[in-house]
Amino acid sequence: MHPGKRLVGKVAIVTGGASGIGAETARVFALHGAKVLLTDSNAALGKSVASEISDSGGTAAFATQDVCDEASWATIVTQAEENHGRLDILCNIAGISGRDPKMNIQTSVTTAGPRLTEQTLEQWNRVMAVNATGVFLGTKAAIPAMRRAGGGSIINISSICGIIGSHANAAYHASKGAVRIFSKAAAIQFAPDRIRVNSIHPGFVDTPMTRPGHSNPEVARLRLEATPLGRFGTPADIAAGCLYLASDEASWVTGSELVIDGGMTAN
């Protein structure tokens, strides 16, 4: 993406900023003039992304964060305001699949995570904590700062799994469905404050989280066959949607769900 001015003067927090969609969104926001505070639990990768942005002429800083920790959110929002005087954009991207990290390859389309009767309460709670509670805590923390700034944009990354079901991983579906409807509720509540809240629903995107599945040729083939445009999405595809919703071009867009899935859910 070429440099632009769509976010000049704006300050953004991007969670999950160390890799994949989060890292690309942080880069794109900075490329369009935003001052970016990116957060992640992976400090080494996060600092590397922030340094890359700064070395390219952008403005970025990194902070280690567990999005499930409410106190960390107060610290992050305060840091953004103290460093740059305001907060305009929050992009909640941090998320987990809930798959067993020891599985380095997905064996079939039905093993994208445990089936419902095999899913433990611990697994359920962890997925919901990161994917849903983290979004709630971030939104709650950002609202007062955005009110002080005269408005803002909150972008919550859900998934096509928040719209449709599948053979496995009910916790992931439930968490992403929660993000979808939570975003609509927040949009209605804070529209009078000129705070817009929208969700983005990626399809099969090539990221570190999806590579265990895509490493299996059969899984990759079936997913591509289910995608009318015939390719996996890239982090840049999703970052472009985040850029639009963060910009003033989307000033009349709130409570919406932006599906970026190569046509899969229309098929």
Where are these regions (language model features)?
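Canonical Rossmann dinucleotide-binding motif of NAD(H)/NADP(H)-dependent dehydrogenases/reductases
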Residues: K5-L37, A186
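Substrate-binding pocket helix/loop in short-chain dehydrogenase/reductase
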Residues: P101-L116, T120-N125, R223
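Short, small/polar-rich loop/turn modules that mediate ligand/substrate recognition or access, typified
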Residues: A191, R196, V253-G255
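Alpha-helical segment proximal to the catalytic Tyr-Lys
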Residues: P144, I188-Q189, S251
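Active-site helix of classical SDR
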Residues: T139, S175, S183
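Short C-terminal tail/terminal secondary-structure segment
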Residues: H2-G4, I164, T207, L229, ...
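Residue(s) in the substrate-gating loop at a strand-loop-helix junction
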Residues: S159
